[in-house]
Amino acid sequence: CIRDRIKIKPERSKTDHMYKIGTWIRDNTQGIGTMTYVKGTSFGGLGHGIYDMDTGTLLKIKGGLLLDPQIYSIKKGKSGTPGEIVGSIEYKEENILGSIKKNTEKGIYGTIPKKQQKAYKIGYRQDIKPGKAYILSNVSGTMKQYEIQINKIVPSDKDVLKSMEIEVTDKELLKLTNGIIQGMSGSPILQNGKLIGAVTHVFVNDPMKGYAILMETMLYEMEN
């Protein structure tokens, strides 16, 4: 049970002249996305924030759970209609991977107790080059590397969620998803063996293309 105290200023009704308040309580929200990295016992994921579907504002959260979802199918993307990973989330103890502590414009962050196996060096903006790179995704049910192309590195004074323009070139992934689909946000991007960023957005009119955030941006957001 979560309790909180807030201050509300009542407004006088124009109809019956009584003081009233209006409340809108959102109990929880859920969705499927990708955990990007683990550093020690902390993690970062999504690469962008979780927003209220009705108001379009960034959700202020008390906390949350990182869970292992059940994936049923893949809906391929097409021009004008983003695809998606179709699945469900069961709130069972065995599905809990970690705890979400904060939801920011640059991703979700929290803690995770499990030790991870493979470690990557971090690639910073100056290390990134246009050309071949890879994304890590388990969209097929197994974690795999898929080839992509970094088409453009966007200047640092622009939208940090769109720091790189990327394009899926891997034939296997294109056959499976037709490009970037909802649920792949947060998928790690590797270049020259270094972790350089994460997928954030898909081009609505071209699902093969999308945007990515830099890893240095997510790490800074987690630590500050």
What kind of region is each of these model predictions?
Residues 185:
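Active-site rim segments in enzyme catalytic domains, especially the processed small/beta chain
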Residues 1-4:
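Conserved small/polar residues in nucleotide/adenosyl-binding loops
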Residues 222-224:
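A cross-kingdom feature marking charged/low-complexity
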Residues 7-178, 182, 191-192, 200, ...:
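Serine endopeptidase catalytic core focused on the charge-relay Asp
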